[in-house]
């Protein structure tokens, strides 16, 4: 037996197979973090969706805290807001959109203002002055205070209340008092009752690093210059000023002006860092299928009551995109959208020293490609995980443990169990039947019947190739092993005259096409052409079809399978998530080896779609469904009238492959395969067999350990259980066997393994 060398712990190859640019492009396809339609329409980027979420729960304090992030004076802004967000609400497509403005007013009215942070904040050294009153100076004062600028406001008004009244005379008295309280609590310096004549202003300008003013004052200082609408700056005069048109304009201009102040004090261009200002276009996708429209809650002139605001907020559908997560067990289990998960996986590949905590998530993806179909932008999580695995392998940072058993199984299929022969009477053939490694392991009689039928009913000769297509190493990211498999298969195909491959498995079909560039068709296509075998018979009860991951995007295969079932008289029940949207059974991508619990949940998810028996055209799918207790048949079982009806364990699967090879060589090519025979027997308790299958320990591994025991007689005797315990290291794994000796040989009661190496001290 050939073993795979474990990675080196100190030797690192700096060969990245995944670039940051490629990953950034892939991540950009995920729209999960794109702003909701209402949020994107707001020039302040108010998180309206989040506000409505908390308002619907009656948590007006939390909702107000979100609103306070975008403006220092929420009551003034919400009263003057023109609500561009409302027309972008997706509910407008079905009926009435959300009355966002009225809910915001209720949030401001009923919400408890948050306490100012007690965290010590360092004030900036540069000083600012603001001359005049009105909406723009008021909002700008609040924005500069947020940014911790020492700011002095010079105005003609006599006090805070008059200053607020000058800016927002339409406010109700109670609202005005609240905003006065908010303004007076800010860390700002006010000089009331000033005569804002030019000598006074110019004298105060000398005391400041940045000069800001109302439009009225700015015209006095620079009558021939107007402020740039993008940066709110009269550049020649060096005065920051803004418009006097509306509440929305003034508040937005104040935000722009505050950024200008930031840039000026840093000696940077005031035109830089402006890309993210204002309303934006969102790429968010929200599936409205199944949504129902509703009428908005009527609003009186006094606005919503608290209860009415809660009911209106509850109408919000919380626009988001989770199309891929709806059907993908993998993404749901990790509770992360693909963009975030992909970023974490990429970062994991770049770690040189330290723990690679994303190895298990990276290896848990089934690489099925379902997300590419469900995602509106075709985000391919399978490509991310596959590239990450290859990257970890190429940099010698990928542990062998998660995939070693599957890789060893592939090597077994392509060595001891491998067979390649032309049809008797032919040196080269028109076709070669490639049933796939799982078919020979699970239903060897089906392989025999299918091959003999193809030989009888097709012209030009049909060769047979038993082996693995290389998908195992491809999924594991072991690209060098895949190349060796490709080379082996190419050489064998060349001996046969490079025939067309008749694949019995859609994953094999896909792998052989992509890796070898070979001519490949499915056995189902051949049978559709030459007709059903005589023994073909469908089930008498309705059945559900599970489409294999390897057939995703292959409409021809999907249609042919359904046509064959119809020809056999099967009644097919349509299920959710079928054809290209079909989920993975849990075997693909080696999930069943790297994360058994995840794979089991994937299988359960597949079976939730219907209570009917499942018809598959992938033997691995059929095997996993049977193991979950669901009646399942591979379509070839129906076509050839064979019900394998078995659930072979991992050791039986290997034995089935060897036995299939032996029988075919003997019955078709008249060749005898000499099987090794022992002069003793090894028996197993049922608990031992179950345990070994669960822990992926082969009977051949146990027998190798017992063979070593026969040579060295090294074992520990357990006085309590009267069992012998022996061990042996095979490749990268140390196997332990608990057994008793019998007259015929040995009875194995338990077996377990680990990856530690037991060192024996000699002479001590």
Predicted regions and their residues:
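Iron-sulfur-cluster electron-transfer modules
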Residues: 36-39, 49-209, 335-519, 657-666
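Ribonuclease/tRNase effector modules and their secretory precursors
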Residues: 649, 654-655, 659-764
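Cofactor-cradling patches in redox/metallo enzymes
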Residues: 166-174, 438-524, 550-663
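Ferredoxin-type iron-sulfur electron-transfer modules and their immediate structural context
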Residues: 1-118, 181, 188, 213-364
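Short glycine-/small-residue-rich Rossmann-like dinucleotide-binding loops
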Residues: 215-217, 376, 506, 619
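A conserved helix-loop-strand patch within extracytoplasmic ligand-binding domains
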Residues: 520-544
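Short, flexible hinge/linker loops that cap or flank conserved catalytic cores
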Residues: 32, 120-123, 232, 425, ...
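Short hydrophobic beta-strand segments
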Residues: 127-132, 212, 430-436, 541-549, ...
């Amino acid at each position: 037996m050939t073993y795979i060398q474990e990675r080196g712990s100190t030797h690192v190859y700096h060969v990245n197979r995944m670039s940051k640019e490629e990953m950034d492009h892939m991540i950009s396809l995920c729209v999960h973090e794109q702003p909701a339609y209402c949020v994107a329409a707001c020039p302040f980027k108010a998180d309206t969706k989040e506000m409505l979420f908390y308002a619907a729960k009656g948590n007006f304090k939390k909702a107000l805290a979100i609103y306070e992030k975008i403006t220092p004076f929420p009551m003034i802004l919400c009263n003057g807001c023109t609500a561009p967000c409302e027309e972008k609400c997706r509910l407008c497509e079905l009926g009435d959109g959300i009355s966002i403005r009225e809910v915001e007013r209720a949030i401001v009215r009923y919400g408890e203002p948050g306490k100012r942070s007690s965290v010590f904040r360092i004030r900036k050294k540069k000083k600012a002055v603001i001359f005049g009153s009105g909406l723009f100076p008021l909002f700008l004062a609040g924005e500069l205070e947020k940014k911790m600028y020492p700011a002095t406001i010079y105005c003609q008004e006599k006090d805070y209340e008059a200053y607020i009244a000058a800016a927002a005379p339409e406010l109700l008295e109670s609202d005005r008092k609240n905003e006065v309280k908010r303004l007076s609590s800010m860390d700002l310096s006010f000089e009331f009752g000033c005569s804002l004549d030019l000598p006074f202003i110019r004298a105060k300008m000398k005391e400041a690093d940045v000069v800001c003013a109302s439009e009225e004052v700015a015209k006095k200082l620079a009558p021939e210059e107007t402020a740039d609408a993008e940066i709110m700056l009269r550049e020649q005069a060096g005065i920051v000023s803004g418009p006097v048109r509306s509440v929305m304009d003034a508040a937005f201009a104040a935000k722009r002006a505050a950024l200008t102040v930031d840039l000026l004090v840093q000696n940077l261009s005031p035109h830089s860092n402006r890309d993210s200002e204002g309303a934006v276009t969102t790429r968010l996708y929200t599936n409205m299928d199944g949504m129902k429209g509703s009428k908005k809650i009527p609003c009186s002139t006094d606005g919503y009551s608290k209860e009415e605001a809660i009911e209106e907020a509850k109408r919000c559908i919380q626009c988001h995109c989770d199309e891929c997560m709806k059907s993908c067990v993998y993404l749901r289990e990790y509770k992360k959208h693909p963009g975030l998960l992909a970023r974490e996986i990429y970062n994991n590949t770049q770690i040189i020293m330290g723990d690679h905590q994303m190895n298990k998530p990276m290896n848990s993806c089934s690489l099925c490609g379902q997300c590419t179909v469900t995602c509106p932008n075709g985000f391919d999580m399978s490509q991310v995980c596959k590239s990450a695995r290859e990257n970890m392998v190429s940099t010698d940072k990928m542990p062998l443990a998660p995939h070693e058993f599957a890789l060893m199984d592939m090597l077994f299929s392509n060595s001891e169990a491998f067979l390649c022969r032309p049809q008797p009477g032919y040196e080269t053939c028109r076709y070669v039947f490639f049933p796939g490694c799982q078919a020979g392991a699970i239903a060897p009689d089906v392989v025999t019947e299918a091959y003999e039928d193809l030989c009888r009913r097709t012209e030009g000769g049909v060769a047979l190739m038993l082996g693995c297509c290389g998908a195992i190493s491809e999924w594991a990211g072991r690209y060098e092993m895949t190349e060796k498999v490709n080379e082996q298969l190419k050489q064998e195909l060349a001996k046969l005259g490079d025939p067309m491959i008749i694949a019995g498995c859609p994953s094999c079909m896909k792998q052989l096409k992509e890796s070898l560039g070979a001519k490949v068709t499915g056995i189902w296509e051949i049978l559709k052409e030459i007709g059903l075998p005589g023994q073909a018979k469908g089930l008498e009860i309705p059945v559900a079809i599970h489409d294999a991951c390897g057939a995703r995007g292959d409409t021809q295969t999907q249609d042919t399978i359904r046509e064959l079932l119809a020809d056999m008289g099967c009644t097919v029940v349509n299920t959710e998530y079928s054809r290209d949207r079909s989920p993975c059974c849990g075997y693909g991508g080696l999930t069943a080896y790297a994360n058994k619990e995840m794979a089991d949940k994937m299988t359960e998810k597949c079976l939730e779609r219907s209570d009917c028996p499942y018809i598959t055209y992938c033997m691995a799918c059929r095997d996993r469904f049977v193991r979950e207790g669901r009646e399942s048949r591979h379509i070839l079982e129906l076509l050839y009238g064979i019900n394998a009806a078995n659930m072979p364990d991992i050791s039986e699967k290997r034995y089935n492959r060897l036995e299939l090879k032996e029988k075919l060589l003997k019955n078709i090519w008249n060749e005898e395969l000499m099987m090794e025979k022992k002069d003793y027997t090894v028996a197993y308790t049922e608990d031992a067999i179950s345990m070994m299958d669960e822990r992926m320990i082969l009977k051949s591994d146990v027998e190798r350990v017992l063979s070593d025991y026969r040579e060295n007689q090294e074992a520990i005797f357990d006085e309590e259980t009267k069992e012998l315990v022996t061990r042996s290291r095979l490749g990268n794994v140390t196997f332990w066997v608990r057994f008793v000796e019998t007259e015929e040989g040995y009875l194995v009661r338990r077996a377990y393994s680990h990856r530690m190496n037991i060192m024996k001290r000699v002479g001590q």
